């Protein structure tokens, strides 16, 4: 909680992790979620879904089993009350208007990370987007 309240913190980033198995358990800790929600710092997530599928892991399978559509709109809806911005892949541009109409800003990029250069580029773009939302 101390790190979350650090005045030097410029915002919050949710990595493209499984929202159901990785992110939600952290956010289920009331003090963590409340502190993030009460902060005036921007909150951005990177979609774990690209083109209707998860890159790795069971995210898409879990979404299907829950009766959810496997797309970035479902991710936006899941994080709707939490995030200010969502970074989606170029292949999912068709969802920009729907996501933005829900009040979430969208940045479109190549979010598939095949190597360290891709990871660095996406991290830099994510920080830039976070700063734009400040």
What is each of the regions a protein language model found here?
Residues 8-22:
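Short acidic, glycine-rich surface-loop motifs adjacent to enzyme active sites
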Residues 1-6:
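A short, well-structured juxtamembrane/interface segment
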Residues 10-13, 42, 85:
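Structural motif
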Residues 17-21, 49-51, 92:
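Short glycine-rich anion-binding loops that position phosphate/pyrophosphate groups of nucleotides
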Residues 56-134:
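C-terminal functional extensions of proteins
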Residues 39-56, 111-113:
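Short, flexible loop segments at boundaries between secondary-structure elements
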Residues 34-40, 80:
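Short, conserved loop/helix-junction motifs that constitute active-site signature segments
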Residues 25-34:
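Charged helix-capping and loop-helix junction motifs
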């Amino acid at each position: 909680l101390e790190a979350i309240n650090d005045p030097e913190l410029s915002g919050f980033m949710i990595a493209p992790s499984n929202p159901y198995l990785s992110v939600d358990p952290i956010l289920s800790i009331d003090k963590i979620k409340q502190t993030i929600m009460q902060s005036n710092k921007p909150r951005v997530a990177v979609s774990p879904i690209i083109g209707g599928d998860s890159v790795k892991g069971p995210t898409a399978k879990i979404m299907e089993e829950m009766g959810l559509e496997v797309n970035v709109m479902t991710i936006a809806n899941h994080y709707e009350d939490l995030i200010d911005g969502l970074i989606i892949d170029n292949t999912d541009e068709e969802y920009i208007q729907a996501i933005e109409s829900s009040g979430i800003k969208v940045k479109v990029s190549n979010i598939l990370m095949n190597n360290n250069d891709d990871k660095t580029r996406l991290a830099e773009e994510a920080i830039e987007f976070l700063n734009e939302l400040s």
